[in-house]
Amino acid sequence: MFSKQQVHVLLILWMAKRPLTHEEIERMAVLAKYDDTPQGLRTRMIELERSGHVYRVDRDGVNSRHRHCWRFALTDDGREAISELFGKTETI
């Protein structure tokens, strides 16, 4: 089972539909009013990477200090985990 913070990271990556940097994930967490700390989100991201739900895409991201940083995306296992947690959605 996933922790609350892990679910937040999975949801943010799923909603974005593109690879994100840590800073982008932190900004989206603030906008969604998740009460996670930046370090907590980073820790959960690494846990999800180790479990095979998230992977590092490339180092083409740029952070606020204009340095290159990793971008992360969901693996197939990560997408399956989201669909198992929330079920299939149908468009009307």
PLM segments and residue spans:
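Short alpha-helical segments that sit at the start of domains
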Residues: 1-16
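DNA-binding alpha-helical recognition surfaces that contact promoter or target DNA
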Residues: 11, 27, 43
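Short acidic, hydrophobic short linear motifs in intrinsically disordered regions
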Residues: 19-30
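A short, conserved structural fragment
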Residues: 49-60
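Short, amphipathic alpha-helical interaction segments positioned at domain boundaries
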Residues: 70-92
